[in-house]
Amino acid sequence: MKLIKHVFIIGLSICSIQANAQQIKSTTMTNREIVTKFLNGFNNPEQIQESLALLSDDYSFKNPMVELNSKEEFMVLAKQISAIITEIEIINIAENGNWIAVFYDFGSSVEGLESNVGTEWFRVEGGLIKESNLIYDTVEWRKFYAQMKE
């Protein structure tokens, strides 16, 4: 009888461990899903905090006009750009190990800059975005920011 109890308890434990492992597996996002969720957060102001939570504290961001070296610095920029970015539409996404490359169109509320094509390379480690490099045509954006300073 004791043997049956032990076998029953061991069986329950194994089932419980397997169920827990399945639950953990289903809640873990892939690198591609992490980057997609991050970018989609800019489409909905209510989700932007969830997006920013996907950045590591030492996140580094580069684009042709700025270089930032922390999540805190990027959060200031994100607040500014979320006021003029109207949407991000992912056109294509590719993955190679830790690196995710995304080709997207980002819309803005700035006259003459309503549609902008960019490509951004993200490095993801341990479920967080560690760095990204955004490449886009900045000619008209530089003019826009120069006018704002005047």
Model region roles, listed by residue range:
Residues 1-29:
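Bacterial Sec-dependent N-terminal signal peptides
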Residues 21-150:
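C-terminal and inter-domain tail/linker signature
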